[in-house]
Amino acid sequence: VTPHQKYVFSPDDFNHTSEQTKAFVKRNLKYLLDTYHIDGFRFDFTKGFTQKQTTGDDDLAATDPARVSVLKEYYEAVKAVKEDAMVTMEHFCANEETTLATEGIHFWRNMNHSYCQSAMGWKDNSDFSGLYDTTRPNQFVGYMESHDEERCAYKQIEYGNGALKTNLSER
């Protein structure tokens, strides 16, 4: 059962607190590291690695010790196979991010708007300070585009400032 219907478009969902699920995920992580020699993983929507029933973003982002435990366990499984592998999570639960960052986990930080503003040549809102948070470990990986955020080049051509809009060599 999916405990957070808002974000999952199928009734099927892994129960990450199940020992069988954890063994399955860890076995697959090991296989990918050993077979393909990849340098790490980015986990999408780790906020959803919970079995708590939630009704909204605040509930879903609330601290969930079981979720933290599962994510640490997956991180440790990766590090046991390849010590220098990078683990990045799209999490969006501030308190848990602080806890998990002290373990060494990195977090996906949406900087799409800032990147687009900068690429278009607009100083307003092209601030990248969201990548730096002095109140917790600096474990952010800022991204310009992803499967959720896109169209930076399109915006540059459509809304760019001066020559950035029309002259490819200026971009």
Predicted segments — roles?
Residues 37-38:
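A structural motif
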Residues 17, 143-146, 155:
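Surface-exposed loop/turn and secondary-structure junction residues enriched for glycine/proline
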Residues 29, 99-100, 153-156:
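Short conserved micro-motifs at the rims of enzyme active sites and ligand-binding pockets
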Residues 21, 25-32, 70, 74, ...:
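Alpha-helical packing segments of well-folded alpha/beta enzyme cores
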Residues 1-20, 28-31, 47-63:
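Aromatic- and acidic-residue-enriched carbohydrate-binding clefts of CAZyme catalytic domains
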Residues 155-169:
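A solvent-exposed, charged loop/short amphipathic helix patch at secondary-structure junctions
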Residues 5, 45-149, 165-169:
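Active-site-proximal helices and loops of the catalytic beta/alpha 8
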